[in-house]
Amino acid sequence: MADRRNLFFFYGDDKATLVEKMKPIYRILEENGFTILDHPKNANAIVSVGDDATFLQAVRKTGFREDCLYAGISTKDEISFYCDFHIDHVDTALQEITKNEIEVRKYPTIQVDVDGSTSFHCLNEFSLRSSIIKTFVVDVHVDDLYFETFRGDGLVVSTPTGSTAYNKSLHGAVVDPLIPCFQVSELASLNNNTYRTLGSPFILNHERTLTLKLRPDGNDYPVIGMDNEALSIKQVEKAVVRLSDKQIKTVKLKNNSFWEKVQRTFL
């Protein structure tokens, strides 16, 4: 990151307070040859200030750029999965950057195409959920294979890094982000003689394509989740999900691996 000198800082809630707190850090950065930009267009490093939710927003609002690095500064009690640095210790982080104590990790994303007209990426997960208090029916296809018919509250498709989020609360597996794959988990599936699903999360490799076809039973206006944002689409017939070639390059400390974060967070 030492050669990435044009920085854009992305803030979530309470921006005014955080900007004021960051001013001394801005001075330190500028004294060390960094330029603070007001717009991400010409940035080659984008830094989120907040928490993991802020980091997800920073990536989405700046277009999942592959030509720059993303870094996260936590304002909470601890560093988190996407935030390797803390707002109270950024001066220490700068020393680690200049001493080459950091490394760049590439995280996979998933691409979702809805009805051939709307396309977007997700860093954590894509979710398809019933928008009313009623189950909906989805035919699940893996590549060209009709796999199962799901009836329930929804489906969640997560990346390896997203496997520790919504997916984990659905008893999905925590997946090493070095494995190029994506995972499908169920939300309250209904299993009987008419509808039968695998009943457990399943993992698809990077060459697979997942197709979700909604049956028109009066509940084909689902809520579509893109990480921590909702997408409003009047009617959905089909969603096609695959692992994207687009990867997000993040800055992490060498002594703070994915599994160390998992251990610190859950054990």
UniProtKB/Swiss-Prot annotation:
Keyword terms, alphabetized: ATP-binding, Cytoplasm, Kinase, NAD, NADP, Nucleotide-binding, Transferase
One GO biological-process annotation of the entry reads: NADP biosynthetic process
Has the keyword Membrane been applied to this entry? no
Q: In which residues is NAD(+) bound?
A: D52, A53, N124, E125, R151, D153, T164, A165, Y166, N167, K168, S169, A188
Entry EC no(s): 2.7.1.23
Signal peptide range: none
Q: Where in the cell is it found?
A: Cytoplasm
Q: What is this enzyme's catalytic activity, as reactions? A: NAD(+) + ATP = ADP + NADP(+) + H(+)
Which molecular-function annotation in GO is an example for this chain? NAD binding
Q: Which residues form the active site?
A: D52
Cofactor(s) needed, names only, are: a divalent metal cation
User: Disulfide pairs?
Assistant: none
Q: Which NCBIfam families match?
A: PRK03501.1
What family does this belong to? Belongs to the NAD kinase family.
How is this protein named in the record?
NAD kinase 2
What organism is this sequence from?
A: Bacillus cereus (strain ATCC 14579 / DSM 31 / CCUG 7414 / JCM 2152 / NBRC 15305 / NCIMB 9373 / NCTC 2599 / NRRL B-3711)
Gene that produces this protein: nadK2
